[in-house]
Amino acid sequence: MYLELQIKKTHIFDLKGNKVEEIELPIFFSYPVRKDLIRRVFISEFTKALQPKGRDPMAGKRTSALSFGINLGLARVPRVKTTGEAALAPNTVGGRLAFPPTVEKKLVEEVNKKEKKLAIISALSATANMNFVKNRGHVFSIDTLPIIVVDDITKLTKTKEIIEVLESLKVYEDVERVKDRIRIRSGKGKMRGRRYKEPKGPLFVIHENNPVFVKAASNIPGVDVILASDLSVIHLAPGGHPGRLTIYTKSSIDVLRKRFEGRLAL
């Protein structure tokens, strides 16, 4: 199936929020958004990080317990001699598990290579769609999507400077939304290094790695930074929901164009 896609144009912003140039977007920013594929590929990427777990084959079985038999007025569960304490059976304290987890369990959701590529393209297209970005809950005042800025942004070294850029681009409201919604996690996860639940805010897609910029941007709540060459559905559609508020550098668009354009025919 082939679709007629219209090439979109957009502006490039400087660090003060002024429009400095107009460019044609790669064709994949016009692709239809396949939410079903994005969800499947997100699950696939997410499950790749899961660690297989099992149980000690002898867990709950290190006992000499045997059933006392019948006609004693007792349940016929295995019992420890002399004490009569029930053991070994799944319904007893300290007994074995009836169906323990096994390391052989298949954890990863498998998807085809072309489906994975199409899902990333769909997620990229959603970042250029005002409806998807707003429906995801992001708050911003800018009227142009996707947001593309000059490459000089990666030279910034201070968190304060990056915040000023976000304010000039009229997207800092989304960071404030994240701040207001940070909350303590329920359950035991708060004791295991996952104390706070933090919503996802703006995503920076950059063309080259600059550790100083990455660290400065990561200090801002909800903000993530990723190389265009490493971009995946995990970053573009957290939770499998497309339409993350994304800020691209000018050169990152060229990297994405080389990576995806002309690879798929619809």
Swiss-Prot record:
Q: Which GO terms describe its biological process?
A: translation
Q: One Gene Ontology cellular component annotation? A: ribonucleoprotein complex
Listed as disulfide-bonded, the cysteine pairs are: none
Keyword list (alphabetical) reads: Ribonucleoprotein, Ribosomal protein, RNA-binding, rRNA-binding
GO-annotated molecular function: rRNA binding; structural constituent of ribosome
Please explain the role this protein plays, according to its UniProt record: One of the primary rRNA binding proteins, this protein initially binds near the 5'-end of the 23S rRNA. It is important during the early stages of 50S assembly. It makes multiple contacts with different domains of the 23S rRNA in the assembled 50S subunit and ribosome. Forms part of the polypeptide exit tunnel.
Assembly notes = Part of the 50S ribosomal subunit.
NCBIfam families attached here?
Answer: rpl4p_arch
Provide the family line: Belongs to the universal ribosomal protein uL4 family.
Protein name from the UniProt record: Large ribosomal subunit protein uL4
Lineage, broadest ranks: Archaea, Thermoproteota, Thermoprotei, Sulfolobales, Sulfolobaceae
Gene symbol of the encoding locus:
rpl4
